[in-house]
């Protein structure tokens, strides 16, 4: 029986090292008291700062984009007119959803919302912005390059920060799940 207790301690130590590495203070220590639903939420402050600035910058970007589109609309071929109007609508909807998912995922430490924020940023918003910046057929104006460049810079900074925040939230929730199993006697 003593040998089984030693094996159990070794396995417990191993699982703590695997699942609770880099979790730090966000996971409460095993104290014998039942784990309640109230736990410490650790949002990424740097991601929140960039989301805050992005939320204020986005209306300015939208107004500049509409003004620049109106100024050069007569100079563009028909297919570019269609593409730019569709891009304006798509990017506006995606950006609003992306910012909402970023705020709720980061502040409430919700992994699906934070993952959705990362996916929308990488798979949709970044390629659309790079198209607006790099396609010479759009005849970009200097103001247009500047506002698209700033929004792209925000996006390129937010992507790695959000990936780290997602990893941190996932580890935190995995640690809580592991602790719940320990406290219930199932693990």
UniProtKB/Swiss-Prot annotation:
Biological process terms in GO annotation: cilium assembly; smoothened signaling pathway
Choose one Gene Ontology CC annotation of this protein and give it. Answer: MKS complex
Q: Which domain of life is it from?
A: Eukaryota
- What subunit structure does UniProt give? Part of the tectonic-like complex (also named B9 complex).
Recorded protein name is Transmembrane protein 17A
The record, for InterPro entries, names: Uncharacterised_TM-17
The entry's keywords: Cell membrane, Cell projection, Cilium, Cilium biogenesis/degradation, Membrane, Transmembrane, Transmembrane helix
Organism expressing this protein natively:
Xenopus tropicalis
Function, as annotated: Transmembrane component of the tectonic-like complex, a complex localized at the transition zone of primary cilia and acting as a barrier that prevents diffusion of transmembrane proteins between the cilia and plasma membranes. Required for ciliogenesis and sonic hedgehog/SHH signaling.
Could you confirm whether the keyword Phosphoprotein appears in this record? no
- Name of the coding gene: tmem17-a
| TM region positions | 49-69, 82-102, 114-134, 146-166
Task: Provide the membrane topology annotation.
Answer: Multi-pass membrane protein
Q: Where in the cell is it found?
A: Cell projection, Cilium membrane
Q: What is its main location?
A: membrane
The major lineage groups are: Eukaryota, Metazoa, Chordata, Craniata, Vertebrata
Its family remark reads: Belongs to the TMEM17 family.
């Amino acid at each position: 029986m003593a040998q089984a207790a030693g094996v159990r301690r070794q396995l417990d130590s191993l699982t703590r090292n695997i699942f609770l590495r880099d979790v730090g203070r966000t996971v409460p220590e095993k104290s014998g008291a039942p784990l309640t639903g109230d736990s410490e939420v650790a949002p990424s402050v740097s991601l929140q700062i960039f989301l805050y600035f992005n939320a204020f910058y986005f209306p300015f970007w939208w107004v500049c984009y509409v003004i620049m589109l109106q100024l050069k609309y007569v100079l563009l071929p028909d297919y570019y007119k269609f593409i730019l109007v569709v891009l304006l609508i798509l990017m506006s909807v995606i950006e609003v959803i992306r910012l909402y998912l970023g705020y709720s995922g980061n502040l409430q430490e919700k992994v699906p919302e934070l993952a959705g924020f990362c996916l929308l940023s990488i798979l949709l918003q970044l390629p659309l912005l790079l198209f607006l910046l790099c396609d010479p057929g759009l005849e970009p104006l200097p103001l247009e390059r500047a506002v698209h460049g700033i929004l792209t810079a925000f996006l390129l900074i937010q992507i790695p920060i959000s990936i780290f925040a997602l990893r941190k939230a996932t580890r935190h929730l995995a640690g809580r799940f592991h602790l719940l199993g320990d406290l219930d006697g199932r693990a």
